């Protein structure tokens, strides 16, 4: 299993951007003169409530401690479709969004969006009240409550159902809700409910209702039928911003690697920040969920290999999942 970059057990294939920035930062510290960044305004970055933003929150404590390379304006949204227009209009510089949505946006903006990092691997689980689901095939004939129509949960679920011989449109009844909190509320009032939920909502639902059982880990199910990583989220940048401020993007990735490392090692501090920022309702939920959230910071060649492999699987299943065609080489940001 790969470690988040920036930690003591960093992957050997960690981004050149991060290592270059780290070494140049160390050199500039020795001289006590760090070159000013090309952008003076805070970096405007949006995230969704839940795992894709849990790796970002430590940027705020780093900023307060004076150890961040820049100031951050972290904005939180409930659904990805709230972020898209802001990114397109240039009212955001970066965003942490579902991987397939990043590919779709790349098509919509004629290459105006670039991926800079994978931020989250698999976080989806099937939960149920009872003990009836032990394989994907057991979902036949059932109603499944889920979030994420048009993003990762829908496409992962459809892919897994199809790979296990089920027709997603005929053999199951998938009901979509805009936010995970709606799914958990619906589960509480529905008998024999089955839901696809991401962490940390799996943990939150389990703490509220001890009859809930994690029936399937969809990452494990994915690994049985696909030879690529299951990727939940990527962090993207507007290409125009990246071209104007490549130094800021590289400095962000160095900060981000530290933030992700803290999310995986300082559970108490990260959990408190998650509650404070509204990323997760309660620190206790965040702390319990963090080890299961697969928060990473994969950049450079790892980013390209993992995301392109994942998008290929989605494309082969349904080209619409990635915006009709696979993104070109320029979709993957690399340090110049």
Q: Where are these predicted regions, by residue range?
A:
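Short, glycine-/small- and polar/acidic-enriched structural segments
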Residues: 18-21, 32-169, 175-176, 193, ...
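Pocket-lining segment of extracytoplasmic ligand-binding domains
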Residues: 100-101, 109, 182-273
